[in-house]
């Protein structure tokens, strides 16, 4: 078979596999959407987990069915904001399990359905590493007037950011070309997606936020309590994120995003999570705090204690970068002097 034909067949098979993975995701979402007539929004679900924690609500995680509706938040279409003044009431407490009674549900309309379709479409383009244009979105996805496009794009962008950890950025405003950028400064060997192409960065940022707001070290049971409110259960396969325990204690640990260690002198043994070296390298406390602030529709500075700690971390990172550059410059200068000395001796 000619080489060109083989290349076309491989490309076609790659597209088929990508479509298959996302079609499986869409099928799973459709099933859960049928179970919940009015699923909560992407922002509302995460906001309720974090916001209720910050407000100090009583510990009372709801059952599996309600948590399942929470887990569909990546494709739910409603967009909500907290009532006025709610941020003024926030207290800085560690993120832990809290009830989700504030979760709102909304009727689904044509615009909401378009948001869901656009999220699917953008995830597909991200997996295929294909450019995203406004013209393609209008023609192939939204199929509606340009006046509705900004609202649909804004909501889809929020879901992608809060759940999948992807930022939608316009790279060529004149041509309306967009790209999806991972919130982490991923290395070349990063594997924060599975065979469906669903990025797990949003979930990782959530875990890093739990660790950060619990004094940079959190007991495993506290992470599971938050996971349960998000519809993630130990030993139960999740249609987007796989088996949570494997992801949390093996995959993310193997990738060096998390450290999983036994609590000293604990009997029976208990375990805790810390940031791994890769998390420190690819994100920062400030970026994680910005993520939490985005979830709660507020500014990072509203969380004064954590903001102060994040600022100190930024300053330390800046000093480390300056010191590293100085070392590189000094090394380069020393090598230049050695070469110059050898050259003069030869002459």
Curated annotation (Swiss-Prot):
Biased composition annotated in UniProt, kind: Basic residues: 1-18
Q: Does this UniProt record's set of keywords contain Translocase?
A: no
* One Gene Ontology term from the biological process aspect of the record: negative regulation of transcription by RNA polymerase II
Pinpoint the MAGE domain residues.
111-310
Q: Which controlled-vocabulary keywords does the entry list?
A: Tumor antigen
Matches recorded under PROSITE patterns: MAGE
**One matching Pfam family, short form?**
MAGE
From which residue to which does the signal peptide run?
none
Q: Which InterPro entries match?
A: MAGE (IPR037445), MAGE_N (IPR021072), MAGE_WH1 (IPR041898), MAGE_WH2 (IPR041899), MHD_dom (IPR002190)
Question: Region labeled Disordered — which residues?
Answer: 1-20, 56-92, 328-347
Which residues lie in Low complexity bias regions?
A: 67-78
- Enumerate composition-biased segments (Basic and acidic residues): 81-92
* Gene3D superfamilies for the chain: MAGE homology domain, winged helix WH1 motif, MAGE homology domain, winged helix WH2 motif
Q: How is this protein annotated for GO cellular component?
A: nucleus
Q: Specify the superkingdom.
A: Eukaryota
Q: What's the protein called, per UniProt?
A: Melanoma-associated antigen B10
Species per Swiss-Prot/TrEMBL record: Homo sapiens (Human)
Question: What gene does the UniProt entry assign to this protein?
Answer: MAGEB10
């Amino acid at each position: 078979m000619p080489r060109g034909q083989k290349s076309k067949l491989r490309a076609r098979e790659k597209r088929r596999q990508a479509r298959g993975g996302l079609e499986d995701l869409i099928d799973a979402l459709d099933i859960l959407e049928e179970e919940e007539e009015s699923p909560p929004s992407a922002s509302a679900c995460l906001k309720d987990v974090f916001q209720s924690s910050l407000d100090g609500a009583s510990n009372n995680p709801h059952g599996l069915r309600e948590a399942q509706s929470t887990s569909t938040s990546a494709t739910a279409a409603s967009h909500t904001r907290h009532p006025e003044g709610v941020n003024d009431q926030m207290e800085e407490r560690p993120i832990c399990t809290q009830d989700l009674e504030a979760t709102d549900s909304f009727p689904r309309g044509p615009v909401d359905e378009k948001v869901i379709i656009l999220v699917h479409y953008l995830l597909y383009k991200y997996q295929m590493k294909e450019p995203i244009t406004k013209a393609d979105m209008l023609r192939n996805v939204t199929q509606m007037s340009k006046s509705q496009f900004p609202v649909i794009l804004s909501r889809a962008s929020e879901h992608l950011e809060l759940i999948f950890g992807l930022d939608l950025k316009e790279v060529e405003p004149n041509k309306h070309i967009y790209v999806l950028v991972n919130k982490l400064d991923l290395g070349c060997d990063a594997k924060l997606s599975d065979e469906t192409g669903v990025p797990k960065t949003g979930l990782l940022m959530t875990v890093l936020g739990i660790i950060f707001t619990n004094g940079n070290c959190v007991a495993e049971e506290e992470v599971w309590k938050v996971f349960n409110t998000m519809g993630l259960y130990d030993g139960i396969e999740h249609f987007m994120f796989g088996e949570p325990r494997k992801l949390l204690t093996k995959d993310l640990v193997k990738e060096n995003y998390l450290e999983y260690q036994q609590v000293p002198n604990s009997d029976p043994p208990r375990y805790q999570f810390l940031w791994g070296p890769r998390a420190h390298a690819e994100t920062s406390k400030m970026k994680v705090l910005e993520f939490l602030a985005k979830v709660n529709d507020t500014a990072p500075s509203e969380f004064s204690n954590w903001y102060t700690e994040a600022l100190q971390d930024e300053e330390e990172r800046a000093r480390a970068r300056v010191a590293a550059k100085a070392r590189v410059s000094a090394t380069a200068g020393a090598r230049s002097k050695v070469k110059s000395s050898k050259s003069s001796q030869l002459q």
